């Protein structure tokens, strides 16, 4: 009996084949809408005095920063073809070098995090300098963390629809049509194929093997699980504004770091720290570290710094308010 699952033949990157509207693009639209609605609902629920037009300006900067940051990180850090260095305008255009429409398929969330902080910081210190958006900025980051994590899984489902970001070889896994095939002469390949019921014919030089659906695992833990932890646990123990955002960054980085062990390293990059070169299907090492894991460690440390800094800001406000009350 076959011990693998074939990728659904009816599933395609486009919502309707032949029409350039992709699940990936729709996932971003829905995540933005969910975040916009949720954050505004929280503002109204907590009776925070922020004008709608100021909030929309803030959200525009946040979305723009996230997209630019994610796009820059994907094209300049992960892509090693050199196409974006020789044709930098392609970074911000939904076309390839031959002007075929592709949409914005390459995004890296680590860069998105950075852009989603830098762009709003710029706008609240310029256009929104004298508004309550600046006053409640840290509170808004907390709202945004819960909002984004609630819709995050949509992006990973879109990755699955694209048959991309799949995991390593596993019995009972899914045979992704776009996965890189293995040379049948690689040690362990024929034995593995035979053990799961895949037939290798004498003339077959390459074979596609089942993979871990790591994009779905990432989506589950970095999305719903993280969101529930933020909402039901950390929201209740929150002592100051900015705390939840810092915790969210650390939670995301924590889950991402360990789930990366299940994920196939990026083809162009491989392992950044290649302690033990992999020569067969059965070999594995926790000391082989990918780019995603390195960036996740940086992100985790950044989240910790955010928690510490925002705690000091909160303590300073309490001290100033106490001194003011004492003087009065």
UniProtKB/Swiss-Prot annotation:
Subcellular localization, as worded in the UniProt entry: Cell inner membrane
GO cellular component, one term: plasma membrane
Coiled-coil spans in chain: none
Segments traversing the membrane: 15-35, 58-78, 106-126, 242-262, 289-309
Catalytic activity, EC: 2.5.1.145
Topological relation to the membrane, as annotated: Multi-pass membrane protein
Principal subcellular localization: membrane
A GO molecular-function annotation: phosphatidylglycerol-prolipoprotein diacylglyceryl transferase activity
Family membership: Belongs to the Lgt family.
Protein name as annotated: Phosphatidylglycerol--prolipoprotein diacylglyceryl transferase
Origin species: Borrelia garinii subsp. bavariensis (strain ATCC BAA-2496 / DSM 23469 / PBi) (Borreliella bavariensis)
Lineage of source species: Bacteria, Pseudomonadati, Spirochaetota, Spirochaetia, Spirochaetales
Gene symbol of the encoding locus: lgt
């Amino acid at each position: 009996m076959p011990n693998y699952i074939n990728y659904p033949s009816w599933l395609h990157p486009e919502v309707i084949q032949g029409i350039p509207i992709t699940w990936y693009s729709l996932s971003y639209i829905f995540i933005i809408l969910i975040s916009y609605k949720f954050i505004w609902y929280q503002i109204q629920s907590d009776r925070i005095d922020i004008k709608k037009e100021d909030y929309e300006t803030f959200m525009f900067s946040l979305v723009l920063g996230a997209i630019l940051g994610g796009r820059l990180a994907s094209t300049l850090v992960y892509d090693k073809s050199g196409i974006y260095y020789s044709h930098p305008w392609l970074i911000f255009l939904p076309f390839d070098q031959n002007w075929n429409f592709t949409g914005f398929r390459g995004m890296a969330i680590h860069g998105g995090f950075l852009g989603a902080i830098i762009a709003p910081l710029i706008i609240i210190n310029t256009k929104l300098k004298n508004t309550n958006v600046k006053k409640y900025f840290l509170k808004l980051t907390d709202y945004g963390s819960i909002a984004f994590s609630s819709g995050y899984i949509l992006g990973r489902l879109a990755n699955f629809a694209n048959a991309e970001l799949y995991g390593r070889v596993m019995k009972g896994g899914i045979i992704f049509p776009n996965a890189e095939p293995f040379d049948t002469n690689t040690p362990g390949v024929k034995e593995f194929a035979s053990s799961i019921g895949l037939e290798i014919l004498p003339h077959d030089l390459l074979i596609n093997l089942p993979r871990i659906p790591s994009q779905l695992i990432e989506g589950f833990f970095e999305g719903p699980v993280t969101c529930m932890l933020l909402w039901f646990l950390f929201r209740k123990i929150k002592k100051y504004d900015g705390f939840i955002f810092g915790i969210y960054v650390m939670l995301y980085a924590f889950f991402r770091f360990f789930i990366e062990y299940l994920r196939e390293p990026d083809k162009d990059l491989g392992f950044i720290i290649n302690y033990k070169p992999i020569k067969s299907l059965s070999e594995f090492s926790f000391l082989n570290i990918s780019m995603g894991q390195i960036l996740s460690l940086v992100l985790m440390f950044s989240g910790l710094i955010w928690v510490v800094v925002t705690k000091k800001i909160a303590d300073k406000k309490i001290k100033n308010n106490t001194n003011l009350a004492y003087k009065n």
